[in-house]
Swiss-Prot record:
Cytoplasmic topological segments: 1-28, 83-97, 161-182
Entry-linked Pfam families: CASP_dom
Subunit and interaction comment: Homodimer and heterodimers.
Subcellular location: Cell membrane
Protein source organism: Oryza sativa subsp. japonica
Keyword match Manganese: no
Name of the protein in question: CASP-like protein 4C1
Cellular-component GO terms for this entry: plasma membrane
Entry keywords, A to Z: Cell membrane, Membrane, Transmembrane, Transmembrane helix
Keyword set includes Heme: no
TM ranges: 29-49, 62-82, 98-118, 140-160
PANTHER family per record: CASP-LIKE PROTEIN 4A4 (PTHR33573), CASP-LIKE PROTEIN 4C1 (PTHR33573:SF56)
Length: 182
C-alpha cells in the first residue's frame, strides 16, 4: 500500500537523515582530532620528562607541565567524543558542552603554543652548549609540542564551527541543504 505521507514530509525526513549523517561525520572528525592531540601531548610530555638535562631549564619544565595538562584534557575530550559518536548525545547539556569545548580548546591551545615556543627558544641555544642527544631529545619534544598545538587548534576550529552551527540553527550539526529549488 502506498504511504499516506506527503512529499514534503518525505523531503523533510531525507533532510533530517543528511543532517544526522553530517553530524556523525563531524563528531568522527572531532574524535580523530582529539585522539591526535592526546597522542602528541603524551609523546611531547614523555620526551620532555625523560630528558633530565633539559628539565633543568624552566622552559622545558613548562613544556612538560603544559603537555601533561593538555594530555589530561585531551583524554577527557576523547572520552566525550567517543560517547557522542557511540550514542549521538553529548555528556553535558548540548549548549554547555559546546561552550565548554570551544573555551577550553582555546585556553589549552594557547598554553600548548606558549610552552612550545618558550622551549623552542631554549632548544635553539642548546647546540651551542654541546648538549648532543639531550639537544635532539629536546628538539623532538618541542616538535611534538607544536604538533599537539596544531591538533588542538584544528579541534578548536571544528568546535568553533559546531558552536556557530548551534547558535545559527539550534543544533550542533550543520544545517542540511534545503530541498526547495529556490
Amino acid at each position: 500500500m502506498p504511504s499516506s505521507s506527503s512529499p514534503a514530509a518525505a523531503a523533510a525526513g531525507e533532510g533530517s537523515g543528511r543532517k544526522k549523517a553530517a553530524g556523525r561525520r563531524l563528531a568522527g572528525v572531532m574524535l580523530l582530532l582529539r585522539l591526535a592531540s592526546l597522542c602528541f601531548a603524551v609523546a611531547a610530555a614523555a620526551f620532555a620528562a625523560t630528558d633530565g638535562a633539559a628539565l633543568r631549564a624552566a622552559p622545558f619544565r613548562f613544556l612538560l607541565a603544559a603537555n601533561a595538562i593538555v594530555a589530561v584534557y585531551s583524554a577527557f575530550e576523547v572520552a566525550a567524543a567517543a560517547w557522542e559518536v557511540a550514542g549521538g548525545a553529548t555528556l553535558l547539556p548540548e549548549a554547555m558542552q559546546l561552550w565548554f569545548d570551544f573555551g577550553h580548546d582555546q585556553g589549552f591551545g594557547y598554553m600548548a603554543l606558549a610552552a612550545a615556543a618558550a622551549a623552542a627558544r631554549e632548544a635553539a641555544t642548546c647546540g651551542s652548549h654541546g648538549g648532543g642527544t639531550a639537544c635532539v631529545q629536546g628538539d623532538i619534544a618541542v616538535g611534538l609540542g607544536f604538533a599537539g598545538f596544531a591538533a588542538v587548534a584544528a579541534a578548536a576550529a571544528a568546535s568553533g564551527y559546531r558552536l556557530a552551527c548551534f547558535l545559527a540553527t539550534g543544533s550542533r550539526s550543520p544545517a542540511s541543504p534545503s530541498s526547495s529549488p529556490y
